[in-house]
UniProtKB/Swiss-Prot annotation:
Free-text disruption phenotype from the record: Not essential, no change in sensitivity to reductant (beta-mercaptoethanol).
Subunit structure: Able to interact with CydA and CydB upon overexpression.
Species, as recorded: Escherichia coli (strain K12)
GO cellular component, one term: cell outer membrane
Stretches that traverse the bilayer: 4-24
Compartments in which it is found: Cell inner membrane
The name this protein goes by in its record: Putative cytochrome bd-II ubiquinol oxidase subunit AppX
Statement: the UniProt record of this protein carries the keyword Cell membrane: yes
Length: 30
């Protein structure tokens, strides 16, 4: 069961970091 939480946690971290990069990218370029 723990591996399921680990997998979901990694997916959440990946999606969050992607969202932050997409959100920051236009601000850094302008």
């Amino acid at each position: 069961m723990w591996y399921l939480l680990w997998f979901v946690g990694i997916l959440l971290m990946c999606s969050l970091s992607t969202l932050v990069l997409v959100w920051l990218d236009p601000r850094l370029k302008s």
